[in-house]
């Protein structure tokens, strides 16, 4: 579920925002630092966590910055263009922009684009593109014209696909829109005509895009308040031919078409977009997050001071001008899933769980086209490169780990995994973890004797994996009957299918107590009830206990009481002692905490043997009795099952196996106890309903008394 957290002001300094707002917000080489370029003469470097500026640079009076400053991720330097043609390069140590490196270009620049893993690109207003190094080698080189006359660039985006840069920019001419896609590994420039569809008079207010392996998903927010999607192939069938693309409706009426201050649209991930503008039913501007997969509004935040109609998103932060100050709104989102839509997911997150940012694995491309040059030897003496900092090891630790798991022993692999996890997390951390688990599981299938359970447990505890990413993991653990690993998967994975959950339950109920004693199981969800069992037995002998306000001895249910009047000597012991050993109880608690959907779970519960169902019901009934002993109706322990979970599973087991369990003699007393349990609950709710009715009558009488409008005069005689 998407969530917008509490906003905060990045700086109280009023920025020089023009009529159209800021020029831009760009990420620096530090994940917590951002470059903010106003519409005047200044570039400010902010640190978001400290909410303060780290540096500020301005061009001379009379000069004006014409495109946002960006960071060259290869060198750690900053690049900006002022007066359309003058390019400046500096770093944190520089103070005066007038004294840093300067290059005057032969054509006007529209935008400088920079992402991690490749050198910056310079997009000129005439549609030509150059790599920064090739451009600086000859600043006065001739720049060709790509777009036609009166065609104006409206928006651009820079991606890295398969380690190769891909640039897309949108142009407009006389109400017609065109998309240009530049592939730098093959030097292919493809032009597309964007067909507006039925409403040809609509104007596109904002663009955003995301990319996968085959398509660029171009989303546009039109003047009719709707969001449309156009799929642009990364590898066109006929690059030389001008092709037409039709847009499809993605979301309808997300903002008002009569927005005064403009609207903005940005893609947050594959399933969510953020929209800035005035909703149809409100006059004030709002920031809203929409799920494009389910076409639902996830969350919204009102912005009473108004905005400039600009929105930027990096990592987990949304940037915008709220009033006259730059505002940051942290954004969190869980991945949309079928389990979240149909099933019951965990509502609490373990304290040790942390969120891993989803970064693309940017890698430096080899031999990109369009004049990309090897930057090891720069032709510019004035630029101070930080070669010592930017040098990379010949073999990254991630590749060393992947090569180790394919051939080395289990102990050596465990040591290498521990070393890798001790390193600082890199943007490709989750990718390496997934590849490592996949490699280990493939080797497990090829070599039956190979089973690095300790490595697998360390990788699961990184909170990066899920069942859908590595389904073979639990399959192998089920074959090995590794209950410790299965328990950990149940605690960490939110998307386990119901069939796998039932397979785990079968093993947890069938494994012998002797085998469990030799197994290390997480016991934090289990409380040692044997401590209080002796005290409870003495209390039952001395006094009569009322459970939930109901005395079982006073309620005579005919045949049930006739059976229960003949109490065996060990009945008290059965009710106060846990029917399973503590380690089995911990495993069963993991089942109770797991996510499920009743529709998909019930058919698989019917396959569990009746004696195991009876044992599970006895344990659940024992947990219910322990809950009833407390006024809060909760169990002791760090992460125990809740009363709702206990009752839900009792109902599920009886629904699936009642006809089988009722035929078992050893289950007779258990079913009678469950019957009395339900009867006592009905009695409690009946009494509560009576109390509620009484309170309503008293409230009604009180209202009638107050509404009579009568008064009385009392005369006191004094003698």
UniProtKB/Swiss-Prot annotation:
The keyword Transcription regulation is annotated on this UniProt entry: yes
Keyword Cell cycle in annotation: no
Main location: nucleus
GO biological process, one term: positive regulation of transcription of nucleolar large rRNA by RNA polymerase I
Superkingdom of source: Eukaryota
Cellular location(s): Nucleus, Nucleolus
One Gene Ontology CC term in the entry: nucleolus
Classification via InterPro entries: NOL11, Nol11_C, NOL11_N, WD40_repeat_dom_sf
Subunit description: Interacts with UTP4. Interacts with FBL/fibrillarin in a transcription-dependent manner. May associate with the proposed t-UTP subcomplex of the SSU processome containing at least UTP4, WDR43, HEATR1, UTP15, WDR75.
Protein name: Nucleolar protein 11
Organism (species): Homo sapiens (Human)
